[in-house]
Amino acid sequence: MLTSPLSPFEHEDSNLLLSAEQLTQYGAFWTAKEISQQPKMWRKVSEQHSDNRTIAAWLTPILAKPQLRIILTGAGTSAYIGDVLAAHIQQHLPLATQQVEAISTTDIVSHPELYLRGNIPTLLISYGRSGNSPESMAAVELAEQLVDDCYHLAITCNGQGKLANYCADKSHCYLYKLPDETHDVSFAMTSSFTCMYLATLLIFAPNSQALMQCIEMAEHILTERLADIRLQSEQPSKRVVFLGGGPLKAIAQEAALKYLELTAGQVVSAFESPLGFRHGPKSLVDSHTQVLVMMSSDPYTRQYDNDLIQELKRDNQALSVLTLSEELLTGSSGLNEVWLGLPFILWCQILAIYKAIQLKVSPDNPCPTGQVNRVVQGVNVYPFVK
């Protein structure tokens, strides 16, 4: 149980109800700091974007191309940003003939001709915490090789990375560097994920009111809900399932990865949509399985969420069936799901770090033997010959 090590501390250096000394002892200092700093970082990213006078000018002629194809790309957590946002950005493009797709760098690198179209003008938006993952530069270089009219927008937390250096001084490239604090030191991406995610929304579909609601919800979680999340983490689960529909499916995927990473695989995690869960994945639910359903803010979609929740409760097989909703955090409803994803993933990040500490796994370095690394290693990138 976490009750003893997670007792509250009124201390300026505390995060997530843990003192700095405890966080260091548990190998959780950086992860806790980076999770907790997110509302502050969202404000900082927004302020930085408001001061940016060049991104709109660079994008305007590109967004005037009727057949423009935008690819949102990254690897792992960075790839999930595109999965969350692609359909939403599609709705905000100026021309109906333009297209947005989320394609991971890992797919582009292994199957370049399957995903890249030489005769279609393409804006490749690359996400990278460090910008040093082998696939990041390989995807950029393949796009340069195969696409006749290609542009690059690098959204990164590291101004010194390979991706940043490539895009810094080329007219068909734009480097959108986030504040240094978003370059997470810990193993798992937390604030880097949400800040690259937010930057994309600010560029293509800004909504200042929605952002303020997200910040308020995140602050509510960090000041009022930590004890609730801690209790959820104390349940003796061996499996955890995150469910979300539409954009929230990719948030569920990122939540599952965070749980898997921070617990070093000691708790098996899975994700699906509420409707998709019945089509086979529901088989993994047993008395050791926690299920967390991320509720849609759309009344139509929510009917499907509620149906599955009631079904899981009637089945009485799961260890617990938890719900995460806008009402839980604010008492109101109606915020678009792409914005809800920000406070929802914060909740799940906290759940994962608490579970890791309970299992005596260091969240800052959950895999000290090196099978999995903060920046991916061991990837051979081969030349592509047309």
Swiss-Prot record:
It catalyses: D-galactosamine 6-phosphate + H2O = D-tagatopyranose 1-phosphate + NH4(+); alpha-D-glucosamine 6-phosphate + H2O = beta-D-fructose 6-phosphate + NH4(+). The keyword Transmembrane does not apply. GO terms for biological process: N-acetylglucosamine metabolic process; phosphoenolpyruvate-dependent sugar phosphotransferase system. Pfam families: SIS. InterPro entries: GatZ_KbaZ_carbometab, GlmS/AgaS_SIS, SIS_AgaS, SIS_dom, SIS_dom_sf. Disulfide bonds: none annotated. GO terms for molecular function: carbohydrate derivative binding; glucosamine-6-phosphate deaminase activity. Its main location: cytoplasm. Its EC number is 3.5.99.-, 3.5.99.6. Residues 59-217, 222-366 form the SIS domain. One of its GO terms (cellular component) is cytoplasm. The keyword Hydrolase applies. It is found in: Cytoplasm. Involved in the pathway of N-acetyl-D-galactosamine degradation. Catalyzes the conversion of D-galactosamine 6-phosphate (GalN-6-P) to D-tagatofuranose 6-phosphate (Tag-6-P). It can also catalyze the conversion of D-glucosamine 6-phosphate. Belongs to the SIS family. AgaS subfamily. This is D-galactosamine-6-phosphate deaminase AgaS. It comes from Shewanella sp. (strain ANA-3). The lineage of its organism: Bacteria, Pseudomonadati, Pseudomonadota, Gammaproteobacteria, Alteromonadales.
